Amino acid sequence: GYDYTKASNLVYNGGIQIYTTMDSQAQSVIEKEYKIDSNFPEPIGYRTDSKGNILNSTGGGVMLYAYSNYINKEGYFKLRSSEYKWNEDGSLTIYAGKRLAIYDTTVQGQTDYSVEFKSMYTIEKGKFYSIPGGYLNIPQQYKKRDADNNLVVSADFFKDYPDFFTQDGKKLATKDFSLKQKVIQPQSAMTIVDNKTGAIKAMIGGRKITGRMLYNRATAPRQPGSSIKPIAVYAPALQKSFECEQAGETFPL
């Protein structure tokens, strides 16, 4: 294969020819239509609790937290008094099982603990966006777990970063967090396939998927699974009036 520099040079200066099954007109049409928000329905029919969190359809557990339950209008996340305690040695305990999720991770071969926001949603200008979480920016060396799996932030952290939290009544406020990129919902993807040859004519991987961390359903590798069979196998067979046990053509690999 070619590296990027060599491939780019061949395309623009070397006269290399690239053959593709893609149909430029079809590709242009689906790209245009995917930019029109009115082509996609807004999420409806979901249940919320008294705080605006979206509940699962079964069981009543929270599926998506309301953005406002994490971040206030001034852009602060505030730890509630029931979510933390100050210890006598000056360290801070953040309780597990509350709004912040605490995960064991490994960074450069060392154990770390990721302090993360749970998935949330927001509605902006009538558009529904999901936000797949985020995390507090606390360096690795200041964190450990206690016997109850709570997170303990050492006293040294508050000496080195005295402005990370500010006391706001009984709450601790901070802006030192990162949120993952919001994603418009519902998402969608499309692949147009020539059912005679199997050639891909056009494809698009989602709505508003510009961004390094966003998932592109057209180009991201994933396990095909049985969900692909109705599209790639059964639908073309039915269109050709194949019977249940009828074999199709075989082609050498």
Language-model features, listed with the residues they occupy:
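Extended, non-catalytic substrate-recognition/exosite surfaces adjacent to catalytic cores, especially
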Residues: G1-S227, I231-L253
